[in-house]
């Protein structure tokens, strides 16, 4: 009987071709069955996760709260959309709040935490899943690590929405510095016009400051042939 636990000890060692072994095992596996105790435990864990991540958005004129962004994404994005997430404070919010319901459709750089990974990942996803939408999520700092790859996305006419969480700083570095040193240094950078940046590559550029504007922009991104950047 399966148990929901973090500690799993092997009972048998299977030596041989992995694909062949799995095929052989699959022939002898019945339809999966989860008993009520396990379902109750899963529901309990789901409730704990929901409670732990139940942060409410605080509204400030002209500035979108991370929860507002994610709630809007959750409302507009379809389940077959591939979402690639760059590294930064937005990455923490996305990991805690955004829900994906298809395997391999929500990509994080957990181990190496590679700044600038989201757009190249999105390009790859758009090439291997040409008939679906891809959304790349990055902070303004991380986006500038690989933003020049918009040229590739435009040249290949890929259906990518590039979403930039713009606060004019490396926020993840900033709050870690403040936690450790009680101050921050070298984390701010000057203003960048990301709409004109996108247009200079031939992509569509949009700017939003409200939840309803983001909803409209995401829908426009779905209806547009080729890459769209939303600042």
Regions picked out by a protein language model, each given a short descriptive name:
Residues 1-3:
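Short, polar loop motifs at secondary-structure junctions
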Residues 44-120, 125:
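Active-site diphosphate/adenylate-binding microenvironment
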Residues 29, 53-57, 205:
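Short amphipathic alpha-helical interaction patches enriched in hydrophobic/aromatic residues
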Residues 26-29, 77:
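Hydrophobic residues within well-ordered, non-membrane alpha-helices that form the packing/core
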């Amino acid at each position: 009987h399966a148990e929901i636990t973090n500690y799993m000890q092997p009972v048998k060692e299977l030596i041989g071709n992995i694909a062949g072994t799995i095929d052989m095992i699959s022939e002898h596996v019945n339809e999966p069955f989860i008993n009520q105790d396990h379902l109750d435990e899963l529901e309990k864990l789901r409730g704990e996760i929901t409670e732990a991540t139940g942060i409410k958005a605080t509204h400030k004129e002209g500035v979108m709260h991370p929860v507002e962004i994610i709630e809007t994404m959750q409302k507009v994005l379809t389940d077959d959309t591939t979402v690639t997430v760059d590294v930064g404070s937005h990455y923490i919010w996305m990991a805690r709040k955004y829900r994906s319901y298809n395997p391999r459709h929500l990509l994080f750089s957990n181990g190496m935490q590679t700044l600038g990974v989201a757009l190249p990942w999105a390009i790859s996803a758009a090439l291997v899943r040409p008939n679906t939408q891809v959304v790349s999520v990055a902070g303004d700092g991380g986006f500038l690590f690989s933003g020049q790859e918009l040229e590739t996305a435009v040249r290949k006419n890929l259906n990518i929405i590039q979403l930039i969480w713009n606060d004019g700083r490396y926020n993840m570095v900033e709050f870690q510095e403040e936690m450790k040193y009680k101050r921050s240094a070298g984390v701010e950078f000057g203003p960048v016009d990301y709409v004109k940046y996108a247009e200079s590559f031939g992509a569509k550029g949009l700017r939003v400051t409200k939840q309803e504007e983001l909803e409209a922009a995401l829908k426009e991104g779905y209806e547009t042939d080729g890459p769209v950047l939303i600042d």
